[in-house]
Amino acid sequence: WYQKTISLNALLLSPLSIVWSVGNLIKKKLSKVQKIDIPVIAVGSAIIGGSGKTPSVLYICRELKKMGYIPHIISRGYGGSTTIDEVIKVKPHMDFNFVGDEALMMSNYFPTWVSKNKFHAMISAKEDGANILVLDDALQSYNVYKNISIYVYDSIQSFGNRLLVPSGPLRESVKNAIRKSQIFFLINTEVCNDLNDSHFKHILKYKIEINPEFKEKKL
């Protein structure tokens, strides 16, 4: 996926990438956007896997807390066994096999909710006292309204071979992901060859230093 040249395997898998793209389009068209009456910040990227999204979410929550907000994190709970109808407020003592390891880690610092249905989790967070929500890995969550979308870009990973799954690491095209983002977080900024791409011209690029050690007390 992250080779500079397109491999034979990627070419052979390209028909499945077309199926993925069509499925994504159908999902987007059928999604009914739901809106909650507190601000919503979505954090994500176009690629599958780690790109610095989780530490970026914690960074954003830390800054929001400094500004007087009460942020709660909404996660899908990747790797966990929660069902589509369950909404779980994550506690640090919970089993990561149930709620997902990233959600478990984030719950040590800020109130964190997991559910396959993000909007149900958003309602629960608001009822629990949140006045702003940060959605982890939510650029492709078409059924919730976002006030701001933040794209997290790892300069080392870049966009890989720029092909859709399974031929490449992209969940959607670079153009689509960038077009719906207002802020662009740059990770590993010593290598930023892609930033001359014409798709990036409208993006507010905000260079940050993400410290993995977060010392805030839980809200």
Q: PLM features: residue spans?
A:
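A transmembrane-helix-recognition feature enriched in membrane-embedded lipid enzymes
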Residues: 1-39
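Phosphate/Mg2+-binding loops and adjacent switch elements
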Residues: 78-196
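A generic structural signal for alpha->beta connector loops
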Residues: 37, 68, 109-110, 181, ...
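Walker A (P-loop) phosphate-binding motif
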Residues: 28-92, 192, 218
